[in-house]
Structure formats: structure tokens, C-alpha cells
Amino acid sequence: MTLKELITRIQPLDEAAMEAARRRQDALAKPPRSLGRLEDLSIQLAGITGKVQNTMDKTHLLVFAADNGVVEEGVSSAPQSVTLMQTVNLTRAKTGASVLCKHFGAGITVCDVGVNAIVREPAVLDRKIAFGTQNIAKGPAMTREQAEKAILIGAQLAMDTPADALGVGEMGIGNTTTSSAVLAVLLGVPVETVTGRGGGITDESFQKKKQVIAQAIALNQPNGKDPVDVLQKVGGFDLAAMCGAFLGAAASHRPVVIDGFISVVAALCAARLCPTARDYFVPSHLSYEIGYRLALEELRLEPIFQLSMRLGEGSGCPLAFQVLSAACGIINDMATFDQAGIDDGYLEEIREGDKFTVEAQK
């Protein structure tokens, strides 16, 4: 499968199924739009799957692990060895994301696409492209061939994973640096507006981080109109594979949950490659990282939660899976007005005037 073939598999949402879901929601025994975002999600799910009634019996988080050569520049407080340790711990329900997956019964797959070490844990899926990327402050992160390979690895894993919904997470020291670089280029904005402190760094290191990102962009001159070029020159193997996972989920007609900052940048890359893919995305939480909101605004999406989270790993995805499940439960199991023995004639005027929309309350 080529990248072009992958993109051609992604189809627009099923408008007929969405309209049927809207009619079903209007027929349920409740004031119009009174379940708000849950109704919106159920309609989105109908468009994604082509079915009005869906389930979230099986949900799965995909975590892509890789190291980033830019850590040589002192942009992270954590040593690079943490990537390997946490990659292994993710498979043992010992990290934030994996504990949440275990708690809610979601599956998790950890995929090594570029850890700078030999990963001896059998539970980690080996798709290593190289032992980390090159230092973007000194040259391109990878070759274009490697970037496309990473995208297709992520896409194939998403398509091969049986689940009603997928989530996309990561593990890689230094990846807020690469994500900020990619986002700055895609949006054409100053580095300072999209660069946060990541896992936590001193003021001196924070200034260094911004300088390194600006230096990397100036040196490599990525083309902001070509997401693959941007990923190749200032991105990471994890980011590229995550981008592919978003595309793969859309190509296989499954909703795919965005986690935090790295995840939303990967989602934006996917949407730039195939704008239709955006309609399959479900943002989980409003990350505390500074660039997250800008990326989400560019995608024209709204997060479900605001929990001041900034862990990454995919930690927001298991929480969002529960909301998707609730959205399915509402449209599947609530009684209609007819079933409840209620005459809903009194709502006709309200329905026609959209008196229960958020805008109508202002």
C-alpha cells in the first residue's frame, strides 16, 4: 500500500446514516438537543460506520514509541533512557495511559518505530525504522522514504487492529520539541506561540528549546504545504506513525481519539494529507500544552474534557472511549416518545425554532 492508495480509501461520512441518527435523537423521550455533545457524537459515529446504532464493546489505544536526536541539545529534563523504560512499562499497566486502559477495559498496543535501544520486551511490537531520528538542529530528522514508511506502519497497524474505536498515543523523550517544530511550520506561526515546557524544564532550558526549534526550521526549510516534508525534516518517527494511524482509522471507518499535544499535531498532519479524515477524529481533552488549542482550532474541533492534563502517552483516550460508549447507549437504549407513551406534539414549535441550541440560550 502506498500513501496515495491509503488516502484514496478515506471516504466522506455517510450523510444518510447521520440524518437517520438525527431523526432517532429527535424521537427519543427528551427535550430536543438536551444531551448535547452525546447526541453529536452518536450522529458522528453513524456517519463513520454507516449505522445508526453502534457499540463500544472493544476499544484500543495504539502507542508509538521513538527517540528523537534533538535531545542532544538539552531540550528535555528527562534522559533518553526513559523512552525505553516507559515503552516497556506501557505493556505492564505501569504508566498513566496503560493504567487507565486497564481500569476501563481498553486494549493497548505499544509499537516501537524508533527507540534508540534494542527493546527486549516481547509485548512491544517491533516496527523499528531506525535507532532514533537525527538531530533536527543539525539536519533533517529522517529521509522522506523513512517518513512515508512510518506513516504506512501506523496506518497498517490501525487497520489491522480490531476495535470499535481507536486512540493514538506516544512515548518518546523530546517529542514535544519536534511537535512544536512541526506545528509552527504547518500553521506558519512563531515558535514561541506553540512551544511549551513539555515534561517540565527550567527557564534556561525552555529558552534553549525555543531557540533549537527556530534553528531547526531555519536550517531544514520544511515546506509547510507538504506534511510529509515537514515530518521528514523536523518531525519524528512517532509523529509520522501516529499521523498514519489517524489515516488508517479513517480508512477503516472507525472513530479515532486524539490525546494530547503530540497526538493533535499528528492528527493535523493527517488532516492536511486528507481533509476528509478530520471527520473521523474525536478530541479527548484540552491539553495544558500551549500549542494544543491552536492545533485543535485549525482542525475546527472541540475537546470533550478540560482536565489540565499534559501527560501524553494516550492517557486521554480511555476516558473519551467511555463518553463514546455513553453516546452509543443513549441512541441505542433510550425510549422514544411513542414507546414511553408521551405525546410530543408540544415540542413541534420548539424543534422548528431550535430553541434548545446553545446559541438560542445566549
Model feature map: region roles:
Residues 2-362:
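N-terminal loops that bind phosphate or other acidic moieties
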